[in-house]
Amino acid sequence: MSGENRAVVPIESNPEVFTNFAHKLGLKNEWAYFDIYSLTEPELLAFLPRPVKAIVLLFPINEDRKSSTSQQITSSYDVIWFKQSVKNACGLYAILHSLSNNQSLLEPGSDLDNFLKSQSDTSSSKNRFDDVTTDQFVLNVIKENVQTFSTGQSEAPEATADTNLHYITYVEENGGIFELDGRNLSGPLYLGKSDPTATDLIEQELVRVRVASYMENANEEDVLNFAMLGLGPNWE
């Protein structure tokens, strides 16, 4: 992938597509992605696989979002963050953020497991994966899985197409809740301390409030463009 053509087809917000890609990277078969239709309605939450280990949000970017990407972590938590270096690859980075911060879900010796272990002594104290080695790893993943990007139920756009839809990830790490966005050059965003009474990530009020803020700030025509995926036990 040349410097002039560092772009991929955007991944469809589809649990099967995300799960297939994650399994290729090393996610154990006992875990999978699934649709989340609400963070607050009990009747919809009751049918979700639990515990939820990560939440991926697809949302339309507006001017408010563009101006808020300078926020950064203000704590020493060991959350892992990848800088996005490939256009339209935010779905892949959402998967990387989900899995890298839940390494117990990875098969030992898998591609991502091996990469993270190889970097454990060389990455910075803030676990910022934004170096040349990381970039090459991501490019290799894309090369080996190029067909996966265009799978799904909808017609795939061109890799170089401009889109206003973007994926970010929420995880809990060492008692903190984080928003991970590869395009936020300041790194991971620390939302605050996790609620110790919550059974998993989907019950964390900080996540609910943050997602709600995106929906409230969206233009009326963009409200239907939101989607959420959760990472949890594979019920199939």
Swiss-Prot record:
Reactions catalysed, as given in the entry: Thiol-dependent hydrolysis of ester, thioester, amide, peptide and isopeptide bonds formed by the C-terminal Gly of ubiquitin (a 76-residue protein attached to proteins as an intracellular targeting signal)
Residues the UniProt record annotates as site (Transition state stabilizer): Q84
InterPro entries, per database record: Papain-like_cys_pep_sf, Peptidase_C12_UCH, Peptidase_C12_UCH_sf, UCH_AS
Domain UCH catalytic: 7-233
Gene Ontology molecular functions: cysteine-type deubiquitinase activity
Residues annotated as the enzyme's active site: C90, H166
Annotated Gene Ontology cellular component terms: cytoplasm
Temperature and activity: Optimum temperature is 27 degrees Celsius.
GO BP, sorted A to Z: protein catabolic process; ubiquitin recycling; ubiquitin-dependent protein catabolic process
Keyword Transcription assigned: no
Gene3D superfamilies: Peptidase C12, ubiquitin carboxyl-terminal hydrolase
Keywords: Hydrolase, Protease, Thiol protease, Ubl conjugation pathway
Site, as annotated: Important for enzyme activity: D181
EC number(s) recorded for this UniProt protein: 3.4.19.12
Other comments on record: Can hydrolyze human UBB(+1), a mutated form of ubiquitin which is not effectively degraded by the proteasome and is associated with neurogenerative disorders. It can do so despite of the fact that the C-terminal 'Gly-76' of ubiquitin has been substituted for a tyrosine in UBB(+1).
Family designation: Belongs to the peptidase C12 family.
Main function: Deubiquitinating enzyme (DUB) that controls levels of cellular ubiquitin through processing of ubiquitin precursors and ubiquitinated proteins. Thiol protease that recognizes and hydrolyzes a peptide bond at the C-terminal glycine of either ubiquitin or RUB1. Preferentially cleaves ubiquitin from peptides and small adducts.
Protein name: Ubiquitin carboxyl-terminal hydrolase YUH1
Species: Saccharomyces cerevisiae (strain ATCC 204508 / S288c) (Baker's yeast)
Lineage: Eukaryota, Fungi, Dikarya, Ascomycota, Saccharomycotina
Gene field: YUH1
